[in-house]
UniProtKB/Swiss-Prot annotation:
UniProt cross-references to InterPro entries, sorted A to Z: Metallo-B-lactamas, PQQ_synth_PqqB, RibonucZ/Hydroxyglut_hydro
Protein name: Coenzyme PQQ synthesis protein B
Function description: May be involved in the transport of PQQ or its precursor to the periplasm.
Pathway: Cofactor biosynthesis; pyrroloquinoline quinone biosynthesis
HAMAP family: PQQ_syn_PqqB
CDD domains cross-referenced by the UniProt entry: PQQB-like_MBL-fold (cd16274)
GO biological process, one term: pyrroloquinoline quinone biosynthetic process
Organism for this UniProt entry: Nitrosococcus oceani (strain ATCC 19707 / BCRC 17464 / JCM 30415 / NCIMB 11848 / C-107)
Family: Belongs to the PqqB family.
Keywords for the protein's UniProt record, in alphabetical order: PQQ biosynthesis, Transport
Lineage: Bacteria, Pseudomonadati, Pseudomonadota, Gammaproteobacteria, Chromatiales
Length: 309
C-alpha cells in the first residue's frame, strides 16, 4: 500500500493568505525552521499507477502537478485518479472537485448520505458539476451507532479494502448538522492491503476518541490523524477567535486527554499527525512543542510525504 500526502495543512494552508500570526509572519520573512503546507488530502494506491484520493482540497491542481505518478500520460486526456472518497463536507476538503471538472467521464465520488446532502444543498458542488463532467455518487453505508460501516473497494484500485468509521467531529458552518451531530457527518477510513496485511487509519477530523476509534488505533500499523491544534484555546491565544479546538471538531494534542496522552500507550503504530493549522507551534521544527512530539514518537506529516506499508 502506497500513501502519498498531497497536502498536510488545515483549512487555509500554511501560511494562510491573510494571516500574520507568529508562524505565518516568520515563514514569509524567511526566519522560520519549517515548510509551507497546502490543505490536506492524501492519495493511496497498490500499484503506483491507479490512485484513490481522500478529500479534494482547493489546492488540488498544484498538488497534482507536484505528484507526477498520478498523471501516467497514456492518452491525450488521462489521469491516474480512479475515485475520490470524501470524509466530510468541509469546504477545504471538497471544493477541489470543481478543479477536476474537465474529467472526460463522471467523477466517481464515495461519501455518506450526510455529506451528499450538504453537497447538493448548502454547498451544491454536485449540482454545479452536473453541467460539466457530472458525479457518479457511491453511497457509503454506516449503521446507526458507533460501529464501522460496510467495507468497500474503489473500482480500479485492486487489493485495497476501505472501511468507513463514524467519528465525532463537526459538520461545516453552512451545514444544518453544525453542532447537531448525525452519523456520517464525518468519517475516518480504515485502509487495509490484504496482500501485505498492513493497515492505516486515516482521520484528519477527530474531535473525540470513542471506544470504537481507540480499538482501531490500537491495531493499526499506521495512524494518520488529526493534528490541527496544539491547545484547546490556541485560536483565542493567537487573538483570532474565541472558538475552542473541540468546538471546531478537533482534539488538541496537549493537555489532559489530548492526542499525545491518547497515543502514549500505543506502542505498535507508526504515529503521524496531519491537518496542521497555521497557528500550531509544531510547525516550527525548532519549537519545544515539536521536540515534545518527537520525544513521544509522533511525526508530523508534510506535503509530498510517502508512506509505504
Amino acid at each position: 500500500m502506497l500513501i502519498h500526502v498531497l497536502g498536510s495543512g488545515a483549512g487555509g494552508g500554511f501560511p494562510q493568505w491573510n494571516c500574520n500570526c507568529h508562524n505565518c509572519n516568520r515563514l514569509r520573512k524567511g526566519n522560520f525552521k519549517g515548510q509551507a503546507r497546502t490543505q490536506s488530502s492524501i492519495a493511496a494506491s497498490t500499484n503506483g499507477t491507479d490512485w484513490v484520493l481522500f478529500n479534494a482540497s482547493p489546492d488540488i491542481l498544484g498538488q497534482l502537478q507536484h505528484f507526477p505518478a498520478i498523471q501516467p500520460g497514456r492518452a491525450l486526456r488521462d489521469t491516474g485518479i480512479r475515485g475520490i472518497v470524501l470524509l466530510d463536507s468541509q469546504i477545504d476538503h471538497t471544493t477541489g472537485l470543481l478543479m477536476l471538472r474537465e474529467h472526460h467521464r463522471p467523477l466517481d465520488v464515495y461519501c455518506t448520505e450526510s455529506v451528499h446532502q450538504d453537497l447538493t444543498t448548502g454547498n451544491p458542488l454536485f449540482k454545479v458539476l452536473e453541467h460539466y463532467c457530472t458525479v457518479n455518487w457511491h453511497p457509503l453505508q454506516l449503521p446507526q451507532g458507533d460501529a464501522p460501516g460496510e467495507g468497500f473497494q474503489v473500482e480500479g484500485i485492486e487489493g485495497l479494502r476501505l472501511t468507513p468509521v463514524p467519528l465525532r467531529s463537526e459538520a461545516p458552518p453552512y451545514s444544518p448538522h453544525r453542532h447537531n451531530y448525525h452519523v456520517g457527518d464525518t468519517i475516518g477510513l480504515w485502509l487495509e492491503d490484504p496482500a501485505t496485511q498492513k493497515s492505516l487509519f486515516y482521520a484528519p477530523g477527530l474531535g473525540q476518541i470513542e471506544d470504537h476509534v481507540l480499538s482501531l488505533m490500537e491495531k493499526a500499523d499506521c495512524l494518520l490523524i488529526d493534528g490541527t491544534f496544539w491547545t484547546e484555546d490556541e485560536m483565542e491565544r493567537a487573538g483570532i477567535t474565541q472558538k475552542r479546538a473541540t468546538e471546531m471538531g478537533h482534539l488538541p494534542q496537549s493537555g489532559q486527554g489530548g492526542m499525545i496522552s491518547v497515543l502514549a500507550p500505543l506502542t505498535s503504530p507508526w504515529k503521524i499527525l496531519i491537518h496542521i493549522n497555521n497557528t500550531n507551534p509544531i510547525l516550527d521544527e525548532e519549537s519545544l512543542e515539536r521536540a515534545q512530539l518527537e520525544a513521544a514518537g509522533i511525526e508530523v506529516a508534510f506535503d509530498g510525504m510517502d508512506i509505504i506499508l
